[in-house]
Every structure is written in structure tokens, then in C-alpha cells.
Amino acid sequence: GASGLIAFPRL
């Protein structure tokens, strides 16, 4: 979710 993207913004 968004928290995951914030924790690991590296895509």
C-alpha cells in the first residue's frame, strides 16, 4: 500500500 511505497520508494 502507500506505507509500503513510503518505506521502499525504490520501484
Curated annotation (Swiss-Prot):
CC terms in the record's Gene Ontology section: extracellular region
Pfam families: Periviscerokin (PF08259)
Gene Ontology biological process terms from the UniProt entry: neuropeptide signaling pathway
UniProt keyword tRNA processing, yes or no: no
Cystine bridges: none
Sorted UniProt keywords: Amidation, Neuropeptide, Secreted
UniProt function note: Mediates visceral muscle contractile activity (myotropic activity).
Post-translational modification Leucine amide, affected residues: L11
Chief place of localization: secreted
Family per record: Belongs to the periviscerokinin family.
Organism: Gongylus gongylodes
InterPro entries linked to this entry: Periviscerokinin (IPR013231)
Locations listed in the record: Secreted
Protein name: Periviscerokinin-2
